[in-house]
Structures are given as structure tokens and as C-alpha cells.
Design a protein with these regions (language model features):
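Glycine-rich, low-complexity segments
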Residues: 1-7, 315-319
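Acidic Gly/Asp/Thr-rich repetitive segments characteristic of extracellular carbohydrate-active
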Residues: 3-30, 37
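Short, T/G/N/S-enriched strand-turn elements that build extracellular solenoid repeat scaffolds
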Residues: 17-23, 36-45, 49, 70-71, ...
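Extracellular beta-strand-rich solenoid/capping regions of secreted or surface-exposed proteins
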Residues: 20, 24, 36-50, 58-118, ...
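Active-site-proximal loop/turn and secondary-structure-junction residues that shape catalytic pockets
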Residues: 35, 142, 169, 213
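Right-handed parallel beta-helix
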Residues: 52-55, 74-85, 115-130, 145-160, ...
Length: 319
């Protein structure tokens, strides 16, 4: 095991090359307890990087204005560590930036659908904090089912977006991800992405789909199941915001307390089996079919609909 193990330098120098050398030589690198400062760890295909839980901190150096602490290749895994943008105390960013935690990146566009992109990778059991961009960022990863990641059992805090999915990025799966105290809990601008048992609570905005300018022909058409969207922007913000989604999206078996739903110029958006608390507002503007089914409220919600004759509200009840 010793040959796979790497200790921290203890002097704050860039450990990126040392980590990459272990990964290239053995396919595995195990980081011990302590702080590992990096400019970017570029993981070779098929490699695995793991730590000792929150005792291991991979820290993106302050000198890096744009980039990621860890860049995934194909068939990579990152497990059991704290990945952070600084060793200093930080607040939630005011704007979305370019410093990311763990990034899976290709170069897909609307026009190169056949080009091979990076393949399946995994993220598990990580605490990710203090990045101006995404804690987990998926950038132009393409349209193939195996050009995707599976992420589970992570906590993401004080980032521009807990999860940041760019356009032309599909088939990613997230389970038991707690995105809290971020500017956005999740920005999901790709398609066919799945979220289950995740928390998008106590962010400025909980969950955003934004295709309002038609930037991507392949947007939305995914699902969110069993997730929470509570206490957005100090109980006055938007829990779910869907803008310009053209191909449908399903939110099912979710909880929404002290947060709003906003849907604009979108089609085939389904909200079903929601438990709602106080201060909820639902706003729909333009677009086509938007369906709200089996909603339970603690008090009568405020519902506003304009320029849309296809909004359904089925089985609304007060407890």
C-alpha cells in the first residue's frame, strides 16, 4: 500500500505533479491526512484518487483565477476527501465565477455530436466548498450515455453553484447530494440529467434550468425525484426556476418550504406529489403545458398564470 500513498508536503507548495505522477505510475493515489495545495490535478484515464475523509484537504491555490482543483479523465474516480477553493473562511459568492472544484469537461457543441468525449467517471463521499464556479462542474460533455458521471453522498457548500451543468452535457446522475448555502444549489442547463434524494435547500436559488435564449437544442428532459427545495434566499427566494425549457422535465415527490416556483416559456413541465409549507408562490408565464398534480399546502398558495392556457392544477389540498 505504501507505493500508492502520498503524504502532504507541509510547506504549501503545489502538489499537483506529485499526485499526477502517482496516478500515472500506479493508477491509484491515496492521500493521507493534511493539506494538499494544487494548481490543478489532471487525472489520467482509468485512475482513482482517494483520501481520508475530511482529514484530507485538496486546496486550489489562490493564484489560480480560472480552472479546477481536480479534472477528471475517462473512467476516473474521486472519493472521500475535502476539496476546497481556499484555506480561508469564505462567504457565498455574489456571482458565478470560473474556479471549480471537481470538473468533467469535453468540447461538445450542437455541431459535433459524433465526436468522442470523456467517458464514465465517479465522485463519492466528498465535501466540496468555497469555489466561485461549480462544486461539481460538467462542461460540454456530449450526448452519449457513457459520457457522464455518477455522483453520490457529497456535501457542497459556499460555491457559485453546488452542481453546475453546462449546455451540451447529458446523462449525469446525482444521488444524495446536499447542496446548501450556495448562490445556486444546481444549474442544470444540459439534458437527460437525473437527481434523486438531493437537498437544494438554503441556497439563494435552489434549482435552475435556463435555456431562455435557445442556446441549446438539447435541453431539459430529465427528472428530479425525492428532493428538497426549502428556505431559498432567507425564505424569500426561488426554489425551482425553469426558463425556456423546450423538451419537458419532471419534478416528483419533492418538498418545497419557504420557496417559490417560477416557470417561463417552457413546455411539458410536470410537478407531481409535492409537500409544501409556507410562503409558497407559483408563477407561470408563457410556454405550453405545465402540470401541477397532487400538491399539499399548509395554506392557500398564491398562483399567477399569464399568456398560457395549458396550465393544469389537479388535486390541490390544504392540510
Amino acid at each position: 500500500m505504501d507505493r500508492y500513498f502520498l503524504s502532504p508536503s507541509g510547506d504549501g507548495r503545489d502538489m499537483s505533479s506529485a499526485i499526477e505522477e502517482k496516478l500515472k505510475e500506479h493508477g491509484v493515489c491515496i492521500l493521507g491526512a493534511g493539506a494538499y495545495y494544487v494548481s490543478t490535478v489532471k487525472m489520467p484515464d482509468g485512475s482513482s484518487l482517494s483520501g481520508m475523509g475530511n482529514a484530507t484537504s485538496v486546496i486550489l491555490m489562490d493564484s489560480v483565477s480560472s480552472g479546477a482543483a481536480i479534472e477528471l479523465g475517462s473512467y476516473c474516480s474521486v472519493r472521500n476527501m475535502h476539496v476546497t477553493g481556499t484555506d480561508k473562511k469564505t462567504d457565498v459568492p455574489d456571482t458565478l465565477g470560473d474556479r471549480h472544484g471537481i470538473r468533467f469537461m469535453g468540447d461538445a457543441t450542437d455541431f459535433n455530436r459524433e465526436k468522442i468525449q470523456p467517458k464514465s467517471s465517479m465522485i463519492e463521499g466528498c465535501l466540496i466548498t468555497s469555489f466561485s464556479g461549480g462544486g461539481i462542474t460538467l462542461m460540454d460533455t456530449g450526448y452519449a450515455i457513457d459520457s457522464s458521471i455518477v455522483a453520490s453522498n457529497c456535501q457542497i457548500m459556499r460555491c457559485g453553484a453546488g452542481i453546475n451543468i453546462f449546455r451540451f452535457s447529458e446523462y449525469h446522475s446525482f444521488t444524495n447530494i446536499n447542496c446548501t448555502d450556495n448562490l445556486y444549489g444546481c444549474i442544470n442547463n444540459g439534458g437527460n440529467n437525473l437527481f434523486s434524494s438531493c437537498h437544494f435547500s438554503s441556497n439563494k436559488t435552489g434549482f435552475l434550468i435556463d435555456n431562455r435564449n435557445g442556446q441549446s437544442n438539447n435541453n431539459s428532459h430529465g427528472s428530479v425525484v425525492g428532493c428538497t427545495f426549502n428556505h431559498s434566499d432567507k425564505n424569500k427566494g426561488i426554489g425551482i426556476e425553469v426558463l425556456g425549457a423546450r423538451h419537458g422535465f419532471v419534478f416528483s415527490s419533492c418538498q418545497l418550504f419557504f420557496s417559490k416556483i417560477v416557470v417561463e416559456n417552457s413546455y411539458g413541465i410536470v410537478f407531481s406529489d409535492f409537500n409544501c409549507g409556507k410562503a409558497e408562490e407559483i408563477t407561470v408565464k408563457g410556454g405550453g403545458l405545465v402540470s401541477f398534480r397532487n400538491f399539499n399546502f399548509s395554506k392557500e398558495p398564491k398562483i399567477s398564470v399569464s399568456d398560457n392556457e395549458k396550465v393544469e392544477t389537479i388535486n390541490f389540498s390544504l392540510r
